[in-house]
UniProtKB/Swiss-Prot annotation:
Subcellular location per the Swiss-Prot or TrEMBL entry: Early endosome membrane; Late endosome membrane
Family indicated by similarity: Belongs to the WD repeat WDR91 family.
Keywords in alphabetical order: Coiled coil, Endosome, Membrane, Phosphoprotein, Repeat, WD repeat
WD repeat extents: 406-445, 448-488, 511-555, 560-599, 602-641, 664-702, 709-747
The name this protein goes by in its record: WD repeat-containing protein 91
């Protein structure tokens, strides 16, 4: 505690010097020098007591102990009163012993003279009144203990420990917790960094194990694909099976009409043809035997001629057993071919080709099937390699995703306050919800507006206040803690639609965009005007209002003609204001000169959303033409980059249902938001938020992460980086708001 007090004293001195409060600073230094509590340093308090004893200043000793009782000991409970009394008694005895040891009996007699009234009725002091008159009190059994060095040390240590425990347990002001909070914060940050590294290590280990498992599965699938069981059985269809079939064939079988199949099969047999017949001759004999076979085929086998009679080999003529074996082999090859075609899902033309070749010749059919299998295997290997190759590490880790579901209609705005602790959301029915999400998701305030609301903005300095722009020309200041409207001001009756609100970072003013009714709005409609594409080309005003007085300061000039301003945004210090209008023009205003510094045609159609970049050297915009463009603010109209976005990222947003139900909503809230360093951008999509990487040289934005979680189109987003972990908000047309907590992957 003493260190915290000393540190706080230095901070207060620094603050007073910074503010110029020199008189207060001198007074503070003077009081610190005369501080009796010694900055809550126990050693200095004990030293002060000993110094008073050494100079025999009994009055000062009594006053100092009374001060300690009044300032410190009085805060203790009554159960500690006996301990305090014992310490006081021991302190006075310690003083008496010191006077006797230093041969100052006069000071001992003075002590009893001044304290007699207080001590004479206390039993523990009855024997001590004779102390100044004893010749050798250190040898007296009653007082010998108090003259020992051990007793003196024990008393000093006991007093020191008592004061230390007292200072540790006493309540302290909030400012003294500053140092402890800093240390605790540093400790938590160190622990978070250790846990972050462990998380990344575990993630890398999981990725490695998954990759190894997938590689093993891929290898197993490849081997299984290359060697199916029936292919292995086909490899065994050789002369050994032929010999087995020939040994079991009946002698009365008829001749086969397809002896050519056997003649085409034998030259490609894997085994030696000598096993077929011991009577097989040289190649010339084989060729003559083939000729005889073909000539005998013309007779169609009317009279069976046994080979034993003619003394010829098995190949010299049609043998009845060979016809049966040939038929069985051909059928088996056909069955295997069909199984292969079903497995590989070949095209109908390939199937017809395979069937024709199977009917013609066995080896050619096998070759055809092998050729058909090759491209399929290659394609499988390419797709597997493409999907399971080395992927770049994700820039963010999704820690959690929660849903806020207290809205029952499409969301228009959803914004996090400056502190990153609360969220304000507004739907098309005029329902405002203010809710927190840390540590638990909880609604803090809820309100329903009688008039339609079109815009929403958090106040910057007093972050408990909300600015709400209506469709009837008013701006309302709502206190989220008191849950009531503080005031409501009338902006303009001719231009009732308050399309955009932006509060200056200094908190002194806010800008307000007022526009005439849209070309499709109905005067008698009670529903909010959620817009229609291309129908916002109406006059508008851009006004500056004072936050404290709630009075209009000035009206900005909109050249070449007044037009509806859809979106507004300040830079970090409030010196610049950027606006996007319905005529597709971006205007940059100098808030010190209160004039338009530059303007340029940015989009074909309306500008839906505009923001400053992270370094504030550029302006980013999304327009009706479906493009996301970065503009250099130092050169008017100079594009830094341009990207085309999907239609579900820019709007208009469409929600379809049964029986032809269709809801169309033109963007009102923010369509994109950046991370803390401006390297990644969050946008809308049909199923959830999408995070893109910025700054790449590609012509297409790199999609890094899909947050998902929505069943309806997302219409507005926000990204808060006030906390250690980034918080992404995505709000959709079904009234659901997803809150996704991300952890940045620090490389």
């Amino acid at each position: 505690m003493a260190e915290a007090v000393e540190r706080t004293d230095e901070l207060v001195r620094e603050y007073l010097l910074f503010r110029g409060f020199t008189h207060t600073l001198r007074q503070l230094d003077a009081e610190i020098k005369a501080d009796k509590e010694k900055g809550f340093r126990v050693d200095k308090i004990v030293d002060q007591l000993q110094q008073l004893m050494q100079v025999y200043d009994l009055a000062a000793l009594r006053d100092y102990w009374s001060y300690l009782e009044r300032r410190l000991f009085s805060r203790l409970e009554d159960i500690y009163r006996p301990t305090i009394n014992k310490l006081k008694t021991s302190l006075f005895r310690f003083y008496l012993v010191y006077t006797i040891q230093t041969n100052r009996n006069d000071k001992a007699q003075e002590f009893f003279a001044k304290q007699a009234t207080e001590l004479q009725n206390q039993a523990e002091w009855k024997d001590w009144f004779v102390l100044p008159f004893l010749p050798s009190p250190d040898t007296n059994p009653t007082f010998a203990t108090y003259f020992s060095r051990q007793w003196a040390d024990t008393f000093i240590i006991s007093l020191h420990n008592f004061l230390s425990v007292l200072f540790q347990c006493m309540p302290v002001p909030v400012i003294l917790n500053f140092d402890a909070e800093c240390q605790r914060t540093n400790q938590v940050q160190e622990e978070n960094e250790v846990l972050r590294q462990k998380l990344f290590a575990l993630q890398a280990e999981v990725h490695r194990l998954k990759k190894e498992e997938q590689q093993q599965e891929e290898a197993a699938a490849l081997v299984q694909h290359k060697l199916p069981p029936y292919v292995s059985s086909m490899d065994r269809l050789g002369d050994s099976e032929l010999a087995l079939v020939c040994s079991q064939r009946p002698a009365s079988l008829s001749q086969s009409p397809r002896v050519g199949f056997l003649s085409s099969l034998l030259p490609q047999s894997k085994k030696s043809p000598s096993r077929l017949s011991p009577a097989q001759g040289p190649p010339q004999a084989q060729s003559s035997a083939k000729k005889d076979t073909f000539s005998s085929q013309a007779t169609k086998g009317k009279d069976p001629v046994p080979g034993a009679k003619d003394g010829k080999s098995l190949l010299s003529g049609p043998v009845p057993g060979e016809a049966s074996w040939t038929h069985q082999r051909q059928r088996r090859l056909q069955d295997h071919g069909k199984e292969r075609r079903e497995l590989l899902s070949t095209s109908s033309s390939q199937t017809q080709c395979a069937e024709k070749k199977l009917e013609g010749s066995g080896p050619e059919a096998e070759l055809c099937l092998d050729l058909h299998m090759g491209p399929v295997e290659a394609l499988a290997r390419v797709s597997t390699a493409g999907s399971e190759g080395d992927r770049p590490e994700q820039p963010f880790i999704v820690l959690s995703q929660e849903e806020y579901g207290e809205h029952h209609s499409s969301i228009m705005h959803c914004r996090v306050d400056c502190s990153g602790r609360r969220v304000a959301s507004l739907d098309v029915d005029g329902v405002i919800k203010v809710w927190s999400f840390n540590p638990i998701m909880q609604t803090k305030a809820s309100s329903i507006s009688k008039s339609p609301l079109l815009s929403l903005e958090w106040a910057t300095k007093r972050d408990r206040l909300l600015l709400l722009g209506s469709g009837v020309g008013t701006v309302r200041l709502y206190d989220t803690e008191a849950k009531k409207n503080l005031c409501e001001i009338n902006i303009n009756d001719d231009m009732p639609r308050i399309l955009s609100l932006a509060c200056s970072p200094n908190g002194a003013s806010f800008v307000c965009s007022a526009a005439a009714p849209s070309l499709t709005s109905q005067p008698d409609s009670s529903a909010p005007d959620i817009g229609s594409k291309g129908m916002n080309q109406v006059p508008g005003k851009l006004l500056l209002w004072d936050t404290k007085t709630m009075k209009q300061q000035l009206q900005f000039s909109l050249d070449p003609e007044p037009i509806a301003i859809n979106c507004t945004a300040f830079n970090h210090n409030g010196n610049l204001l950027v606006t996007g209008a319905a005529d597709g023009v971006i205007r940059l205003f100098d808030m010190q000169q209160h004039g338009c510094a530059m303007s340029w045609k940015a989009h074909c159609g309306e500008v839906y959303s505009v923001e400053f970049s992270y370094d504030e050297n550029a302006v980013n915009s999304i327009g009706e033409d479906g493009k996301f463009i970065q503009w250099n603010i130092h050169k008017s109209g100079l594009k830094v980059s341009e990207y085309s976005l999907p239609s579900d990222a820019t709007g208009p947003f469409v929600l379809s249902g049964y029986s032809g139900y269709k809801q169309v909503q033109v963007p009102r809230g923010r369509l994109f938001a950046f991370d803390s360093e401006g390297n990644y951008m969050l946008t809308c999509s049909a199923t959830g938020g999408l995070i893109y990487k910025l700054g790449s040289e590609e012509k297409v934005l790199e999609n890094c992460l899909s947050l998902g979680g929505h069943r309806a189109p997302v219409v507005t987003v926000d990204w808060s980086t006030a906390m250690d972990c980034g918080t992404c908000l995505t709000a959709s047309m079904d009234g659901k708001i997803k809150l996704t907590t991300l952890l940045a992957h620090k490389l």
